[in-house]
């Protein structure tokens, strides 16, 4: 989201508004990472399922009031409210179950500011006539070592992996 006169990075906007409250920052970060929304005042949802403040607090090792206060602050701030009432979970992450589904996983670690890595990696995979079942990119503002995770229908050749390593900005690749 871009707000004129402010940085365009979503996490920086959230962080600025919560900078005096580390516990609330922790809660807000978890809401973003897990795709949890704040709607209907101060209720926290995973998709259409309302979640308990107590269980969220327990998971994050914070007081339940910190969870409630975070939701109240989000609801009272027009920018935060507009972001958090629209966040949704991204769906299942297949990488951990890939081998049981007959898929392979390619993890690409790269400079997060380099443009075109997803497109170039997808083009190389398509050259081998391999379908991509899922692509998930970590947010570099939320993850210390962000990566692009590709779940593919079959194991890619070593040649394709070597070509991926030559994509500008790519630091390393792992497969499983």
Residue ranges and their predicted role:
Residues 56-57:
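Short alpha-helical "recognition helix" segments of helix-turn-helix
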Residues 46-47:
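Gly/Ser-centered flexible loop/linker motifs
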Residues 2-5, 11-33, 38-43, 73-176:
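A conserved regulatory-domain signal marking ACT and ACT-like small-molecule sensing domains
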């Amino acid at each position: 989201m871009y707000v004129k006169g402010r940085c365009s990075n979503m996490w920086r906007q959230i962080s600025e508004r919560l900078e005096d409250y580390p516990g609330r920052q922790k809660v807000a970060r978890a809401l973003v990472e897990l795709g949890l929304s704040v709607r209907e005042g101060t209720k926290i949802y995973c998709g259409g399922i309302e979640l308990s403040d107590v269980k969220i607090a327990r998971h994050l090792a914070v007081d339940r009031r910190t969870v409630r206060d975070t939701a109240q602050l989000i609801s009272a701030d027009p920018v935060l409210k507009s972001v958090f009432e629209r966040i949704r979970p991204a769906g299942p992450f297949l990488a951990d179950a890939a081998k049981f589904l007959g898929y392979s996983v390619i993890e690409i670690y790269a400079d997060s500011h380099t443009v075109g890595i997803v497109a170039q990696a997808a083009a190389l995979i398509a050259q081998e006539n391999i379908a991509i079942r899922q692509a998930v990119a970590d947010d570099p503002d939320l993850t210390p070592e962000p990566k692009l995770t590709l779940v593919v229908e079959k194991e890619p050749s070593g040649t394709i992996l070597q070509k991926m390593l030559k994509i500008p900005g790519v630091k390393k690749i792992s497969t499983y």
